[in-house]
Amino acid sequence: MVLPMYISEQAVRAVLTYEALIPAIRQALIDYSAGLIDQPPRTILRAGNAEGFRNGWFAVMPVIHGDFMGVKTVTFFPGNAELDPKLGIHTHMAIVELLSRSTGEPLAVMDGRLITEMRTAAVSAVATAALLPPGATSLGILGSGVQARFHIYALGGKTKMHRAPQFGSLRPQ
């Protein structure tokens, strides 16, 4: 077996744009609604009850679509927000693996943190485009963390918003 390509967060950041992601997410939602995507609910395991472990969880999210299979593993450890930011340990971390549907061969392993942040906001951008009343000029963002920031980025180019106030307490990211 040939080792799959590893794609770092920096490499993802260099190529993944909302201009490409939002239409792809829109199509994926259409395909899911049409039954073309096999995606069971995510499995979540709690990681915070054993001594020495910070409260958090670990989730696995498999999917099959077209010629590919994929799985995202993600962790959420809210206590990491209290750690020294210089350590670079985030509250959410993820890995995305892409596999061939015909052979099962691993094709790529990607850092999934940025992918997750952008994908979540892109889903909201698709919903906002479908549901936003004509002529709306303001959209409230509930929260002030990483997701609020990414939602503003995703919605900024797709709406004619003049104001996007955030509602929530600011915490260091």
Outline where the language-model segments fall:
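N-terminal Rossmann-fold NAD(P) dinucleotide-binding loop
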Residues: 148-149
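NAD(P)-binding Rossmann-fold cofactor-contacting core
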Residues: 158-173
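Gly/Ala-rich phosphate-binding loop of Rossmann-like dinucleotide-binding domains
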Residues: 152, 156-157
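Conserved beta-strand elements of the Class I
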Residues: 139-140
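Glycine-rich Rossmann-fold phosphate-binding loop(s) that bind the pyrophosphate
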Residues: 144-145
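N-terminal ligand-binding/catalytic initiation module
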Residues: 1-117, 123-125, 132-135
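Short, intrinsically disordered/low-complexity patches at protein termini
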Residues: 130-132, 173
